Regions:
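Switch/coupling sub-region of P-loop NTPases
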Residues: 73-96, 100-254, 261-265, 269-270, ...
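Non-catalytic accessory segments flanking P-loop/AAA+ NTPase cores
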Residues: 28-29, 40, 120
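Short, charged beta-turn/beta-strand-edge "cap" motif at the junction between a beta-strand
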Residues: 12-17, 33-34, 94-95
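P-loop NTPase nucleotide-binding/switch module
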Residues: 6-8, 15, 22, 35-86, ...
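Glycine/charge-rich, flexible interdomain linkers and switch-proximal surface loops
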Residues: 18, 22-23, 166, 356-363
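Conserved catalytic/coupling modules of large nucleotide/cofactor-utilizing molecular machines
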Residues: 1, 172, 190, 200-376
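Short, compositionally biased
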Residues: 21-32
């Protein structure tokens, strides 16, 4: 127990986490200590890494053909394709399905054997950590997963550092073991929240948005470490909590600017019974190009986005004059848009034990074919 008046000796070392195969299948905290009750992680001979030590910058130009990782979730594979080595964010308020969607992605992608998986729980519920652990254990995926937790009951130091610690270990496996990494973080907003708490304790003056004065550079440094080089790739999926459902919040915008694609979950969509509750008009991706997804997928995406925008404008007109007053062409487009929205609804595998409904997965070709059928 630490208390006032105790003697403190400085070791001259930073916070170091264990590395290597001994960490796979284990649950660690921000300091690299085990949380799973399965004994110590390694021994005194286990190599350790300073979590703040940045890897040497690559001098090689890493140009590789984009590789799409299929998730089996239609709305993601179509609107925000999961591209190896890139960053995708799931943005939404409380209770709209961010964690469920993340767990489904872990379940679907990790089973494909696409690489070593990392899951980092930052400031989230302990219950969700237990559920994820049980899900991975049942699917026999722990043997290919590293887990870090700094849950909401922990002090702000643990919550602020746990993301950095997990990134440091991911860098080790990428650079030393030449592994491709799938990095899942839930929730990046809690990282900012934890740093805010630390800034308040230290008496720092907040910036104009009410956040820690150095938060922009702190987030930038962390995001820059989630990158690929000639040794391997880090593909990251991050959830971002939206306080009071305000997507214009400075912290949300700050993280969003670091991402290649954003999946926006909406309470209004969830209230319609659509799962996953994705707002199709606000969801966007810079990776949705002909060079990455191909001409067929790209042309369909342009047609679908145009139809969905028209659907939103027609909804306002229908509220005033009724659907029967629309022209035949508008009625046809309105009906197609409603079919498309329903087409992107699907049951999740990770929810099967809760609701008894079997989950479904679809290949990208199946998704494109179903959309072509609706648009025909």
């Amino acid at each position: 127990r630490i208390q006032k008046g105790m003697r403190v000796d400085r070791t001259g070392k930073g916070i170091q986490v264990p590395t290597g195969a001994v960490t796979i299948g284990r649950i660690l905290d921000a300091l690299g200590d085990p949380l799973d009750g399965q004994g110590p992680v390694g021994d005194e001979n286990t190599p350790r890494k300073d979590i703040l030590q940045l890897p040497a910058r690559s001098t090689e130009l890493n140009i590789q053909k984009p590789e799409i990782l299929e998730t089996g979730i239609k709305v993601i594979d179509f609107f925000t394709p999961f591209v190896k080595g890139r960053k995708i964010g799931i943005i939404g308020g409380a209770g709209v399905g961010k964690t469920v969607l993340t767990m489904e992605l872990i379940n679907n992608i990790a089973q494909s054997g696409a690489g070593l998986s990392f899951f980092t729980g930052i400031g989230e519920r302990i219950r969700e950590g237990h559920e994820l652990y049980d899900t991975l254990k049942e699917a026999d995926l722990l043997k290919n997963t590293c887990m870090f937790f700094g849950q909401m009951n922990e002090n702000p130091i643990q919550r602020a550092l746990v993301g950095i610690s997990s990134v440091a270990l991911a860098e080790y496996f990428r650079d030393e073991q030449k592994k491709n990494i799938l990095f899942f973080a839930d929730n990046m907003f809690r990282y900012i929240q934890a740093r805010n708490e630390l800034a308040t304790i230290l008496g720092q003056i907040p910036n104009e948005g009410g956040y820690e004065p150095t938060i922009f550079s702190d987030v930038k440094i962390l995001q820059d470490r989630l990158s690929s080089n000639e040794n391997g790739s880090i593909t990251s999926l991050q959830t971002i909590y939206v306080p009071a459902d305000d997507i214009t919040d400075p912290a949300v915008q700050m993280i969003q600017h670091e991402l290649d694609a954003t999946i926006v979950l909406s309470r209004a969509v969830a209230e319609q019974g659509i799962r996953p509750a994705v707002d199709l008009n606000k969801t966007s991706s810079s990776l949705l190009t002909p060079e990455i997804v191909g001409d067929r997928h790209y042309v369909l995406s342009v047609q679908v986005q145009s139809l969905l925008q028209k659907y939103e404008s027609l909804k306002s007109i229908i509220a005033i004059i009724g659907e029967n007053e629309l022209s035949p062409a508008d009625r046809s487009d309105y009906a197609k848009a409603k079919k498309l929205i329903q087409n992107f609804t699907q049951d999740m595998h990770v929810m099967e034990k809760h609701n008894g409904i079997p989950g479904k997965s679809y290949t990208r070709d199946e998704t494109l074919a179903s959309i072509e059928e609706i648009l025909a």
